[in-house]
C-alpha cells in the first residue's frame, strides 16, 4: 500500500 486515510496518495 502506498496511500493513507485522509491524506494525499503517494
Swiss-Prot record:
Q: What is the lineage of its organism?
A: Eukaryota, Metazoa, Chordata, Craniata, Vertebrata
Residues modified as Glycine amide = 10
Q: What is its main location?
A: secreted
Species of the source:
Alligator mississippiensis (American alligator)
Sequence similarity: Belongs to the GnRH family.
**Entry annotated with the keyword NAD:** no
Q: Which Pfam families match?
A: GnRH
A cellular component term (GO) from this record?
extracellular region
Q: Mind listing the UniProt keywords for this protein, alphabetically?
A: Amidation, Hormone, Pyrrolidone carboxylic acid, Secreted
Protein known as: Gonadoliberin-1
Localization in the cell: Secreted
In UniProt terms, what function does this protein have?
Answer: Stimulates the secretion of gonadotropins.
Q: Which InterPro entries match?
A: GnRH (IPR002012)
Pyrrolidone carboxylic acid occurs at which residues?
Answer: 1
Q: Which GO terms describe its molecular function?
A: hormone activity
Amino acid at each position: 500500500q502506498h496511500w493513507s486515510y485522509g491524506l494525499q496518495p503517494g
